[in-house]
């Protein structure tokens, strides 16, 4: 049987999560090509071990510039059209890439199945403003051509796609939830052996804030706590700061006692990073009440194998996920509650929090080869239905939007 050929349209090829998804698709048996924009200066020729077609540079927080790029690429994909013509699946990561992929389907690959992968719901999409209504109309129009919707959190369906975009009713195509789990294809992973138990359970409590750093309110809160109670916490920040969201990120970190920023990191360092902290900061007020309340972030899964205890808001989907599994430290108002919690936290109580995480099944945090095959099978069904063929018994495990499939 020929492998499923997937053309993957991405909004930022430099995002490590893109490389992880590419590896997942390859491990599931698909043949993958990547077409995408980049946030950095340098074009990347290789993403997750496959070739990449550079569509140009775009910028964070510059929606008008990105919209112009999308319009340009809807008209012409350049060398990307060679990749698209042979594809069975056009997989679009984000709304802007769905706009490009739908045009590519019309222009170059009318028989390919269009699949929409939505991993964030921008605050405008939830707004009743005129721009918000226009964007939702655009998304609905583009989704009519899609044969599968992939999301990373069930709240994206229950709080947005079902009530606002008709998923499960007027749009009744399959939905698959692919959580942002770590990907482990090998039997042994050296990172998995790193445990937070290597740290003495007591102050200074070391909090790790890793990944996309974009929450100004979190930084302010942690800096205030570190200054008011010297020796209570140390905060280790690593990753990619969205500097446009901060007044002066570097100066604020440099002036705060007990706060350090160590720059970007490689995925191979995750085990050591999370194994070197007591707590995993999973609070994000960026787009509060909107995307940050609905998503299940990468760091939720990345810290699990190392036993780092997540700190999260109880009212968010992250908090509900942690509560369902009986793990983590949940707060209604961390600005008021975190200090008292840490000051009264005993070594034995902390060990109990950590042991609850380490008692969880491996599959709660880590995706394996079987998960990869399940994802590619869902894509294959989308392609199968696009061709007009009937769904048969071998695809019985994939459900419609009314009964969401999980990977």
Stretches with model-predicted labels:
Residues 16, 217, 264-301, 306, ...:
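Nucleotide-sugar-dependent
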């Amino acid at each position: 049987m020929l492998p499923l050929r997937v053309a993957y349209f991405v909004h930022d090829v430099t995002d490590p999560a893109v490389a992880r998804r590419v590896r997942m698709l390859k491990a599931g048996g698909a043949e993958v090509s990547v077409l995408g924009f980049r946030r950095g200066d340098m074009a990347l020729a290789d993403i997750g071990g496959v070739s990449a077609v550079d569509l140009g540079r775009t910028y964070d927080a510059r929606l008008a510039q990105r919209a112009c790029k999308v319009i340009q690429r809807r008209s012409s994909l350049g060398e990307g059209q060679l990749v698209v013509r042979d594809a069975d699946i056009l997989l679009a990561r984000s709304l802007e890439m769905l706009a490009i992929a739908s045009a590519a389907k019309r222009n170059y690959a009318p028989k390919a199945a269009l699949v929409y992968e939505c991993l964030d719901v921008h605050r405008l999409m939830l707004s009743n403003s005129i721009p918000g209504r226009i964007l939702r109309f655009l998304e609905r129009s583009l989704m009519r051509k899609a044969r599968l919707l992939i999301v990373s959190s069930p709240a994206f369906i229950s709080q947005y796609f079902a009530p606002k975009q008709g998923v499960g009713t007027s749009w009744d195509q399959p939905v698959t939830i692919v959580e942002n789990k770590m990907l482990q294809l090998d039997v042994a992973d050296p990172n998995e052996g790193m445990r937070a138990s290597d740290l003495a359970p007591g102050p200074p409590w070391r909090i790790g804030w890793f990944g996309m750093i974009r929450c100004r309110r979190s930084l302010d809160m942690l800096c205030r706590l570190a200054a008011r109670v010297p020796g209570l916490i140390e905060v280790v920040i690593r990753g990619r700061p969205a500097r446009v969201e901060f007044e002066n990120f570097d100066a604020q970190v440099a002036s705060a006692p007990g706060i350090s920023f160590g720059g970007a990191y490689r995925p191979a360092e995750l085990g050591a990073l999370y194994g070197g902290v007591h707590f995993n900061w999973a609070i994000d007020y960026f787009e509060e009440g909107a995307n940050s309340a609905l998503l299940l972030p990468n760091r939720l899964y990345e810290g699990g194998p190392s036993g780092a205890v997540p700190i999260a808001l109880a009212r968010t989907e992250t908090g509900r996920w942690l509560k369902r599994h009986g793990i983590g430290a949940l707060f209604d108002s961390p600005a008021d509650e975190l200090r008292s919690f840490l000051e009264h936290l005993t070594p034995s109580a902390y060990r109990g929090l950590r042991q609850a995480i380490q008692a969880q099944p491996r599959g709660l945090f880590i995706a394996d080869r079987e998960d990869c095959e399940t994802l590619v099978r869902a894509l294959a069904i989308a392609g199968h239905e696009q061709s007009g063929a009937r769904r048969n018994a071998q695809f019985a495990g994939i459900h419609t939007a009314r009964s969401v499939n999980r990977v």
